[in-house]
Regions:
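Extended, intrinsically disordered, low-complexity segments
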Residues: 102-138
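Short, surface-exposed acidic/glycine-rich loop or hinge patches that mediate macromolecular interfaces
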Residues: 67-68, 90
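Catalytic cores of large soluble enzymes that bind and process phosphate-bearing ligands
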Residues: 6, 40, 87, 91, ...
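Hydrophobic faces of well-ordered beta-strands that scaffold small-molecule active sites
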Residues: 26-28, 61-65, 83-87
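Alpha/beta enzyme core
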Residues: 1-57, 71-80, 93, 97-100, ...
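P-loop/Walker A phosphate-binding loop and immediately adjacent motor/lid segment at beta-alpha junctions
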Residues: 58-60, 107-108
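Short glycine/proline-rich, acidic loop/turn segments that cap or connect secondary-structure elements
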Residues: 87-108
Length: 138
């Protein structure tokens, strides 16, 4: 995680950008990246708090790359001021495994529309679980 600290969003720069552009949301770096991590990242929650204090109240803070981040760290980031969490890689990976297992389980005899429906329901359930885990208690 130390290797990416130089890329962390600076609160003063975020404030200037948000005020100049009047953006609705701002994706910031405080320890996450897109994709699958080799080792779990450690989030700089204090940086999120500093960013939340610096940027306008109507500009939402976005966390990219939440797959692989411990759920309690994501919850801490939400409590500190993140309003949007992008989480996809692990969900896609789990759904791909589900589809492969379903094809193997049926010896390849499952019809495409049945496979698609099963994959959709699996991913929907996974997404609901993630949403519940990331729910803000405020």
């Amino acid at each position: 995680n130390e290797d990416i600290r130089e890329f962390f969003t600076e609160p003063a720069e975020a404030k200037e950008f948000a005020e100049r552009t009047k953006c609705d949301a701002l994706a910031v770096c405080f320890g996450t990246m897109h994709g699958i991590y080799a080792e779990p990242p450690v989030l700089d929650i204090d940086r999120v708090k500093e960013l939340r204090e610096a940027i306008p109240d109507d500009t939402r803070i976005v966390m990219h790359g939440a797959s692989g981040v411990e759920f309690d760290q994501v919850q801490n980031a939400i409590t500190a001021g993140c309003s949007k969490v992008n989480y996809y890689s692990y969900m896609a990976k789990a759904t791909t495994k589900f589809v492969a297992d379903k094809v193997a389980e049926t010896d390849g005899k499952i019809a495409y529309h049945e496979l698609q429906e099963a994959a959709y329901e699996f991913m929907k359930g996974y997404a609901k679980d993630v949403i519940k885990a990331f729910k803000n208690g405020k």
